[in-house]
């Protein structure tokens, strides 16, 4: 009887051990799909970007497709942490939905990109200057804009180069090949975007501006709080100068520098353009207070930045001087008062006395320094 009882206990223990083994195996099988789901979830988090064709603000013919391909190649080489939509797929969406304006993103275009192209963000590249005359010149601004509402500028950067910026002794470093200068310009932009996509976040302009290009006249109201975050809409500058698109170009400079400060939420210029069209606002000589009220109301902004481009000159070849002349002001929405304004005029050879040392050869590089120094007076 005792033996039978011990035998029964042993059988029960044996069966219990087998049951535990099956339970452990089943648990492992149950957890395996969770691991796969987690891996797919991480991959799904990679941002999907639609790179628009280069928008030409140079006023002259330029190899826009070559610039786009160069940018995509450099981003791929830098192993940017993003998925880029194939150009033929993007072209098909643009054609199907008749998207005509590629220099900015409005709500309707963003929805198309999000739904039809499944894009999380759009890369917008604007060409300001392109010249193959020796020494060649190029200027580019690029920005990444989210397609989810509210649209947000996630990243923006730019560059302006001339082949004779750093010619070196006996011109041994002079760049005469336009394609070489193009690669030299695009590569830093691709690196900057790659760094942002890797999680480094927004950074202020790393290049130190030349103090000699600071504004001549500055006004700043005490009502403008330095420790407050403002939402600002930058309106294209009134442009009586001889340079086509100078108003849009200078607006991009201010957007870039305000974004870099960190305490300004800058409205995507495509939304500003959309509101100007919908409200039928025509700036014959600048923006009026009534127009500023309309824009601030519909875009829900604290400040409106606008101004006037008096001169914006580039030159071809070796002989010439880059010139930039502008005024800008910030209008506060509630008080309808100007809380900040500047006036700035400079030439590329300001303060240059020997061997062209310190000379600035493109209006882009000159305006970049001037606008950065002007914007810094807001803080």
Residue map of PLM features:
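Bacterial N-terminal signal peptides that target proteins for export
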Residues: 2-12
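C-terminal/domain-edge helix-coil "capping" segments
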Residues: 26-47, 69, 113-116, 132-137, ...
């Amino acid at each position: 009887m005792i033996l039978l009882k011990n035998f029964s206990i042993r059988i029960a223990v044996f069966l219990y051990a087998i049951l535990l083994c099956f339970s452990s195996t089943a648990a492992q099988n149950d957890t395996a799909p969770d691991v796969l789901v987690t891996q797919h979830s991480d991959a799904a988090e990679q941002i999907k970007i639609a790179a628009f064709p280069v928008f030409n603000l140079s006023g002259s013919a330029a190899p826009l497709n070559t610039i786009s391909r160069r940018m995509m190649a450099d981003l791929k080489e830098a192993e940017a942490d993003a998925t880029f939509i194939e150009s033929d797929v993007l072209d098909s969406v643009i054609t199907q939905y008749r998207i005509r304006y590629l220099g900015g993103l409005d709500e309707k275009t963003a929805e198309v990109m999000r739904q039809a192209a499944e894009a999380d963000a759009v890369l917008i590249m604007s060409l300001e200057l392109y010249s193959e005359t020796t020494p060649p010149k190029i200027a580019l601004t690029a920005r990444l804009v989210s397609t989810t509402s509210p649209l947000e500028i996630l990243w923006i950067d730019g560059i302006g180069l001339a082949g004779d910026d750093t010619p070196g002794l006996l011109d041994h470093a002079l760049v005469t090949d336009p394609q070489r200068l193009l690669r030299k310009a695009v590569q830093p932009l691709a690196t900057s975007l790659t760094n942002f996509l890797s999680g480094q976040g927004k950074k202020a302009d790393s290049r130190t501006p030349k103090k000699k290009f600071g504004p001549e006249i500055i006004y700043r109201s005490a009502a403008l709080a330095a420790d407050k975050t403002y939402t600002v809409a930058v309106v294209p500058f009134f442009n009586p100068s001889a340079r086509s698109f100078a108003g849009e170009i200078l607006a991009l400079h201010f957007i870039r520098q305000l974004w870099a400060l960190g305490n300004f939420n800058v409205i995507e210029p495509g939304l500003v353009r959309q509101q100007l069209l919908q409200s039928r606002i025509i700036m014959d000589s600048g923006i009026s207070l009534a127009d500023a009220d309309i824009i601030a109301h519909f875009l829900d902004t604290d400040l409106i930045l606008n101004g006037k481009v008096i001169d914006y000159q580039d030159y071809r070849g070796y002989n010439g001087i880059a010139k930039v002349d502008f005024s800008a002001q910030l209008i506060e929405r509630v008080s309808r008062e100007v809380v900040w304004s500047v006036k700035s005029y400079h030439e590329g050879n300001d303060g240059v006395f020997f061997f062209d040392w310190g000379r600035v050869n493109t209006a882009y590089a000159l305006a970049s320094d001037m606008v950065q120094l002007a914007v810094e007076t807001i803080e």
